[in-house]
Amino acid sequence: MFGKFGDSNLNLSPTLGYARAMDIRAIRIHEYGGPEVLKFESVDIPEPGEGEALIRHTAIGLNFIDTYHRTGLYPLDLPLSLGTEAAGVVESIGPGVGDVSPGDRVVYTGLPLGAYSTARIYPADRLVPIPDGITDEDAAAVLLKGLTAWYLLRRSYPVKSGDTVLLYAAAGGVGSIAAQWARHLGATVIGVVSTDEKADRGRDKGCAHIIMSDNADIALTVKELTGGKGVAAVYDSCLLYTSDAADERSSVDLGGRRI
């Protein structure tokens, strides 16, 4: 998902930096909790320092991990600005920056947090140029989830044609990308979801089979779907697969992996 931020038509004084010419605002929290703790506040940021760039955001990515930061499941020092992913335009750069220039369209993901803002300072060497033909909204919505899917399918276990894989949360952000990608690689995807609506979405994204997460014996169902062979890889982001280690091993093919 993504949200829009920023004003692409803002006219800046030639004698003032962007950070000084605009009221920069950010979604911040001063305590952990539900959505009610989110505050849209004015913030002061400096001009970019050594190796840094000032980014005017045009779109921000929304990720499930943001709720972990907001609720304190992953505790961080307060107060803080939320958000791990955004796209925008480079407004100015600090000393020693050579990879990006003012006016470049870029996207980023990762620490430090602070993507829920109209503009921010960010390490220039972590900025990714947005190719022509890719919108800022698409870039902001898929970078973190796309990189995660890439790592799962190409590094954790290199999926190949003929493989069968078990994918949890198959209708989520990462799952939607991973299901399509795995099918493109020639794999058969068994998706695990929690609702009928998500089941339809999982099938639409490339899952050949769907298992509901309240299934009493997912491992047995996997064995039945694979003719007793098991899957090449289990991608379990929910840690719901099975508490029975013997069942788990029996539904993963020889040499397969649980990730």
Annotate each language-model stretch with its function.
Residues 253-259:
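Hydrophobic alpha-helical segments, chiefly the membrane-spanning helices
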Residues 15-18:
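Short, positively charged and aromatic/hydrophobic N-terminal segments
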Residues 241-248:
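Conserved small/polar residues in nucleotide/adenosyl-binding loops
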Residues 44-61, 71-114:
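Glycine-rich beta-strand-centered segment in the early N-terminal region that forms part
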Residues 68, 106-171:
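NAD(P)H dinucleotide-binding glycine-rich loop of Rossmann-like/cofactor-binding domains
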Residues 235:
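N-terminal Rossmann-like NAD(P) cofactor-binding module of classical short-chain dehydrogenase/reductase
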Residues 143-216, 220-221:
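Mid-domain Rossmann-like dinucleotide-binding core that forms the NAD(H)/NADP(H) cofactor-binding site
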